[in-house]
């Protein structure tokens, strides 16, 4: 667990070592790209910090549905959206999901049932992202919906 503040030189990206524990390469990939997009998009947002500190973010800012009430909420949303688009390009993900789900019906979004979950797991492995990241990406592309009993 990171302390609330860690001294770093400007431009450094610090990844908690617990992220690389276990077998979750997909989560690691997403987190690294999320942090890279902070460097690309939000470099100026953290320039006022003296000395050079990085603040750890809470899990709710990185995952799940949260209303964008603060500047931090918004920049976390942007980094997540860009990481998702980079790792799971819209057209490629959409085409692959349509190909894999063609026997489940042609009307999208599909309810996220056991069959769809199986496709999500396979696609997450193929794109080297977490199952949760693939689930959110397919939902944001309106390919799946969480209105099925599995998620209620």
Descriptions of predicted regions:
Residues 1-152:
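Active-site hotspot residues in diverse enzymes, especially metal/ion-binding acidic/histidine motifs
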